[in-house]
Every structure is written in structure tokens, then in C-alpha cells.
Amino acid sequence: YAEVPSPAAQAPTAD
């Protein structure tokens, strides 16, 4: 799904 970005990609990588 190119139109909808994955929520994981938007989340900041704290780890």
C-alpha cells in the first residue's frame, strides 16, 4: 500500500 504509510515508520525509534 504505497498510499498509506506504515504506522511503524512514523513512530520514533527509541531503541
Swiss-Prot record:
O-linked glycan consists of a D-galactopyranosyl-backbone, 1-3 or 1-6 linked, substituted with L-arabinofuranosidase probably at the O-3 position. The keyword Lyase does not apply. The modification 4-hydroxyproline is found at P5, P7, P12. Disulfide bonds: none annotated. Glycans are attached at P5, P7, P12. Keywords: Glycoprotein, Hydroxylation. This is Arabinogalactan peptide. It comes from Triticum aestivum.
